[in-house]
């Protein structure tokens, strides 16, 4: 099979394989570094290597200078290349061979078998192996020597001393299982080791649960013929307790019935297990291909018999592409090879029940299963049908018949669309794996006698490759059959189960499949958000996936990216900030994702010196490497190397606005990068435009993502029903599940804002607020000067942004409070509590405080923390429809919430605040807990810093357009900008909660001799004020002579809103600007072309209208 050959009853090749040179057990020694092939090296095949000459009897002792460590030297006799296996120095166990005997062809060497269950590993030995494994794990995630590494070592040591054993964390178990496959010397298909799906079944407590886990494993791995490698890990061996065991050598095997004449009908390799199944209650058939039931054993209990549901066992009837009579032979074989009798050792811990599966190499079926004399032995029957001369071996009838049987196997599996790989492709992939491992680890353990296939030996590249066989940990080991172990507990024969009992076990297992798989399949939902909307969507996604998975919802800055290598399913919901950048809480995730190595570029990227933001934005573009990788993935087979994220399935949803040029750029970059690193995309990137139907787009994508994930992991229920249940307003918010509790603690505003926005905040003080426009203007643009008080957290550079947390207007808050039913006392601090449902084995039902808001009065919540001015989302309208008492209003609200076109028209015409919605639908009864739990958070407003710290130490200047407008084509109510209006009303000494957000990609070039053109209409000039102040400071204080900059500015009228005209003219006179081009869009008697777009060509010396100001 693609992972391991079936080892229970299928011995390896016999002795006499060319003097054992290919076994690599006694290879030459060489220096640590590779050396070129010497001209004196033999070039003939290694069929008869010269024997070493005896040393002279009286030769004087040779004196040699001290040498460094030596490593096995391996040669490829086909191409002449030589390598040195340095990894072999880490071998932790002696091989079966001795200085006088080569035992490399033994199938079950004693040294490769696990310890008896009654012989626990001594504590010191266990500690040593545990330390070695923990060190391996932390080295793999690049955390070696970290505080977490040291704490984990201490934790493991304390656990071993206290209990005699220890427990692996899930990520450690996943790493250990993959490493065990990677280290398996006898497996030819290891290039796929990184794609092994690990199912953690260590919580299993009975044989019935074992059967349920196994059924789920088979269903997942079979995948309707598109086989996937998987392993299920049952509980580890524990001192003083019996083992979990699977008595069958493979999960799916055909019975072998011993006949009275001594012959066997069916598979002779399975006679013994067949008879055991009969003794334990199985009613046998009499066919050649009867699927055996499973004998499963829980600790200290007799084994129990379970029949596999027929729908789980995918079988392939065999036919030949040209020999029509072949189908009449009635041959068939099962799709899934799943070895189930081996022991997994990780860090000294032993797991005696670990069924693992991959896919078949065709020769395992065609040669071993059908042609071996001690198996089905059909070779002569096929030869007779082919009219071959079977009387003499020189006719090569065996070879001819064997080839046609293998052709039939490959043809039949491909016709049935069942994964299989031929021995030529498999061995070629192993050579690639050797090359990969030589680069990555300095070597690769390999057992030549098992790697070379049982057909076409020297026609495959592995035949000509010397190999070194050694044993690393973690590892798979053989173990004695459970019914043969001396002193094994609980192996007695139980009474025969009735057919009804067996059938009932199958029925119970089928009903538990989805539940158990859901408990095992974990989903990580990551969000990156500036406004909180992506977080809200991620939480909705978490509720949906809880229907069939075990999800957790995390902010990107809370997630350690190294965990991606051990994840099964990741869903990303993220917005994009500014010029295609990640949201601030996604910056660390983006940086770490860029530093991970992809499958086609294991070395660092050549552009590592660039800003990660610039590099990350480039990923979302049409990168030739990404295009090449996508094409390779589509054409790939199961012989390709997996990337760093080989076991990851993912899908991404992006939020943005098509009003900006970099729409969903960060989401597109994450989606591309995860695929580039080897992840498998379950669903195409979803995108939600805030200008039109964003929530509807998300709901459709979430449902499709849930459906795709359920199909991939063979779990769950109808996606439409689950999505309807989650997104239904009646199920989203229920009065009886929320209540207000009185809190003694009052609100402190700055700590409260820090709690809500999960970031550091600072208080700045107003120095002045000045209107920059003429008193004759109907609009206002203000210059706000803030005193930072020298706080380190408010240090900035020109080009950075400042985030300000404004309050809502008091009049709006008071009007909304008057609409709340049964509000708490005005001065009483409250918190929302939610009734959490209990779960089996978990905490009982109870009231849990909602942590979103700090304790505060309802008025404070509506003033400082909740957004009451933005148009309500469709989801909130659905909730309000359930609270409307008037049927017509209820119907209208439901229509608006469900019809994206109607909603967008209503939103853009009215742009209503929450209060205006309540005025339009007056029958809505508004409970206070709904406001506190369902309203979006009042988000910080970002402004470009409009000053330079060198020119104004301890100050931050802002250039802010004060927003005021009427909706409904100018006939609706007057709306005000939340932050701009508040800032315009502040007085000297007032406090402003704020923070700095850096913009490292928006800076003046470090080389002052480079030319700069600054283009900004209206308040777009704000950041450039900081640039010219910085440049002026450099000229006058540092004596720099920079290249003069060009400023292109646009406004309406030169006498009304020409911002900073005097400052600009002064800077130009001092050498900061070489040219200042100004366009006035509404200047009386001004030509129509005098807009900003007409001035830009002049800045680049391109043809265009002359818009220079006099």
UniProtKB/Swiss-Prot annotation:
Gene3D superfamilies: 3.40.50.360, NADPH-cytochrome p450 Reductase, Chain A, domain 3 (1.20.990.10), Nitric Oxide Synthase, Chain A, domain 1 (3.90.340.10), Nitric Oxide Synthase, Chain A, domain 3 (3.90.1230.10), Nitric Oxide Synthase,Heme Domain,Chain A domain 2 (3.90.440.10), Nucleotide-binding domain of ferredoxin-NADP reductase (FNR) module (3.40.50.80), Translation factors (2.40.30.10). It is found in: Membrane, Caveola; Cytoplasm, Cytoskeleton; Golgi apparatus; Cell membrane. Residues 1-74, 821-848 are annotated as: Disordered. Keywords: Calcium, Calmodulin-binding, Cell membrane, Cytoplasm, Cytoskeleton, FAD, Flavoprotein, FMN, Golgi apparatus, Heme, Iron, Membrane, Metal-binding, NADP, Oxidoreductase, Phosphoprotein, Zinc. GO terms for cellular component: caveola; cytoskeleton; Golgi apparatus. Induction: Repressed by hypoxemia in fetal brain. It comes from the Eukaryota. Residues 47-69 have a biased composition (Pro residues). Coiled coil: none annotated. The modification Phosphothreonine is found at residue 498. NADP(+) binds at residues 779, 1019, 1052, 1081-1082, 1088. Pfam families: FAD_binding_1, Flavodoxin_1, NAD_binding_1, NO_synthase. Binds 1 FAD. One of its GO terms (molecular function) is FMN binding. It catalyses: 2 L-arginine + 3 NADPH + 4 O2 + H(+) = 2 L-citrulline + 2 nitric oxide + 3 NADP(+) + 4 H2O. Stimulated by calcium/calmodulin. Inhibited by NOSIP and NOSTRIN. Homodimer. Interacts with NOSIP and NOSTRIN. Interacts with HSP90AB1. Forms a complex with ASL, ASS1 and SLC7A1; the complex regulates cell-autonomous L-arginine synthesis and citrulline recycling while channeling extracellular L-arginine to nitric oxide synthesis pathway. This is Nitric oxide synthase 3. The lineage of its organism: Eukaryota, Metazoa, Chordata, Craniata, Vertebrata.
């Amino acid at each position: 099979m693609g992972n391991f050959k079936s080892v229970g009853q299928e011995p390896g090749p016999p002795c006499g394989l060319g003097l054992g040179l290919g076994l690599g057990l006694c290879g030459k020694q060489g220096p640590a570094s590779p050396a070129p092939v010497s001209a004196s090296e033999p070039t003939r095949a290694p069929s008869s290597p010269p024997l070493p000459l005896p040393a002279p009897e009286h030769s004087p002792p040779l004196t040699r200078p001290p040498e460094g460590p030596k490593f096995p030297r391996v040669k490829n006799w086909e191409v002449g290349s030589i390598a040195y296996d340095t990894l072999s120095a880490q071998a932790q166990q002696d091989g079966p061979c001795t200085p006088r005997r080569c035992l490399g062809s033994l199938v079950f060497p004693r040294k490769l078998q696990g310890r008896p269950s009654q012989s626990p590993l001594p504590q010191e030995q266990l500690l040593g192996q545990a330390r070695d494994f923990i060190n391996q794990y932390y080295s793999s995630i690049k955390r070696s020597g970290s505080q977490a590494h040291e704490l984990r070592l201490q934790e493991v040591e304390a656990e071993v001393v206290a209990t005699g054993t220890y427990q692996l964390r899930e990520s450690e178990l996943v790493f250990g299982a993959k490493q065990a496959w990677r280290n398996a010397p006898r497996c030819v298909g290891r290039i796929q080791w990184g794609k092994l799906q690990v199912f953690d079944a260590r919580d299993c407590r009975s044989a019935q649960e074992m059967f349920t886990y196994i059924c789920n494993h088979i269903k997942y791995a079979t995948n309707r013929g598109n086989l996937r490698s998987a392993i299920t890990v049952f509980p580890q061996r524990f001192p003083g307790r019996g083992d979990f065991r699977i008595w069958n050598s493979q999960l799916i095997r055909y019975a072998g019935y011993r006949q009275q004449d001594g012959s066997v009908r069916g598979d002779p390799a399975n006679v013994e297990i067949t008879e055991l199944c009969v003794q334990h209650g199985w009613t046998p058939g009499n066919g050649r291909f009867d699927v055996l039931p499973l004998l499963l054993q829980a600790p200290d209990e007799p084994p129990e018999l379970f029949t596999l549901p027929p729908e789980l066992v995918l079988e392939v009837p065999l036919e030949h592409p040209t020999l029509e009579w072949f189908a009449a032979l009635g041959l068939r074989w099962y799709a899934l090879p799943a070895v189930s009798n081996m022991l997994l050792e990780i860090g000294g811990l032993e797991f005696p029940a670990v069924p693992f599966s991959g896919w078949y190499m065709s020769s395992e079926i065609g040669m071993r299963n059908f042609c071996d004399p001690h198996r089905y032995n059909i070779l002569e029957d096929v030869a007779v049908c082919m009219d071959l001369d079977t009387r003499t071996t020189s006719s090569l009838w065996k070879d001819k018949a064997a080839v046609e049987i293998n052709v039939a196997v490959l043809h039949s599996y491909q016709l049935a669309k069942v994964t299989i790989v031929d021995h030529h492709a498999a061995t070629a992939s192993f050579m690639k794996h050797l090359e990969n491992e030589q680069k990555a680890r300095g070597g690769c353990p390999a057992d030549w006698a098992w790697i070379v296939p049982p057909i076409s030996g020297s026609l495959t590249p592995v035949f000509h490759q010397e190999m070194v066989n050694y044993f690393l940990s973690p590892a798979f080991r053989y173990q004695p059959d459970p019914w043969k172990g001396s002193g094994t507990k609980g192996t007695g024969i139980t009474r025969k189960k009735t057919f009804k009992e067996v059938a009932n076990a199958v029925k119970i297992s089928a009903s538990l499949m989805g539940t158990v798989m859901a408990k095992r399949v974990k989903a990580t939902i990551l969000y990156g958000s500036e406004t909180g909307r992506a977080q809200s969507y991620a939480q909705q996604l978490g509720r949906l996936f809880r229907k069939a998975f075990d999800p957790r919802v995390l902010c990107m800055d809370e997630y350690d990216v190294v965990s991606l290598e051990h994840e099964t399913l990741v869903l990303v919901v993220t917005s994009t900030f500014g010029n295609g950048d990640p949201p601030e809480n996604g910056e660390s995730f983006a940086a770490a994702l860029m530093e991970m190595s992809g499958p086609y570029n294991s070395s660092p990227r050549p552009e590592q010196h660039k800003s990660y933001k610039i590099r990350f934005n480039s990923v979302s573009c049409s990168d030739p490497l990404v295009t090449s990788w996508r094409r390779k993935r589509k054409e790939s087979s199961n012989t390709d190397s997996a990337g760093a994220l080989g076991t990851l399935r993912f899908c991404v949803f992006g939020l943005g606005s098509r009003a900006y040029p970099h729409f969903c750029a960060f989401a597109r970059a994450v989606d591309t990068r995860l695929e580039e690193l080897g992840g498998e995309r379950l669903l195409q990137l979803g995108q939600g435009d805030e200008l039109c139907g964003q929530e509807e787009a998300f709901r459709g994508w979430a449902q499709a993502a849930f459906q795709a994930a359920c199909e991939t992991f063979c779990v769950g229920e109808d996606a439409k029903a689950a999505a309807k249940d989650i997104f239904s307003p009646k199920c989203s918010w229920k009065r009886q599940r929320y209540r207000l509790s009185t809190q003694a603690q009052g609100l402190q505003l700055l700590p409260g804002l820090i709690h809500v926005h999960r970031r550091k905040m600072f208080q700045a003080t107003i120095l002045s607020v000045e209107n920059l426009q003429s008193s004759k203007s109907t609009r206002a643009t203000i210059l706000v000067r803030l005193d930072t008080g020298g706080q380190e957290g408010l240090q900035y550079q020109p080009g950075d942004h400042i985030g300000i947390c404004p309050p809502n207007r008091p009049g709006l808050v008071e009007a909304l409070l008057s609409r709340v039913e049964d509000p708490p006392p005005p001065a009483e601090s409250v918190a929302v509590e939610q009734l959490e449902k209990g779960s089996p084995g978990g905490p009982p039902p109870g009231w849990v405080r909602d942590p979103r808001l700090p304790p505060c009065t309802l008025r404070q919540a509506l003033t400082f923390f909740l957004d009451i001015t933005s148009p309500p989302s469709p989801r909130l309208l659905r909730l309000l429809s359930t609270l409307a008492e008037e049927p017509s209003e209820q119907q209208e609200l439901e229509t608006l919430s469900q019809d994206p076109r109607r909603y967008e028209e209503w939103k853009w015409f009215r742009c209503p605040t929450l209060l205006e919605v309540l005025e339009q639908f007056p029958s809505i009864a508004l409970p206070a807990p709904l406001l506190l739990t369902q309203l979006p958070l009042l988000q910080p407003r970002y402004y470009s810093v409009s000053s330079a710290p060198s020119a104004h130490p301890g100050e931050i200047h802002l250039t802010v357009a004060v927003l005021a407008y009427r909706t409904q084509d100018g006939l609706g109510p007057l709306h005000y900008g939340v932050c701009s209006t508040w800032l315009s009303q502040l007085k000297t000494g007032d406090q402003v909660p704020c923070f700095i957000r850096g913009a490292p990609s928006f800076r003046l070039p470090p080389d002052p001799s480079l030319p700069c053109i600054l283009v900004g209409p209206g308040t777009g000039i704000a950041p450039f004020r900081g640039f010219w102040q910085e440049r002026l400071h450099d000229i006058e204080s540092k004596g720099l002579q920079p290249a003069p900059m060009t400023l292109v500015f646009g406004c309406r009228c030169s006498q009304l809103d020409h911002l900073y005209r005097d400052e600009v003219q002064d800077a130009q006179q001092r050498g900061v600007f070489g040219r200042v081009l100004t366009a006035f869009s509404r200047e009386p008697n001004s030509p129509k072309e005098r807009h900003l777009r007409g001035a830009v060509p002049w800045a680049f010396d391109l043809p265009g209208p002359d818009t220079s100001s006099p």
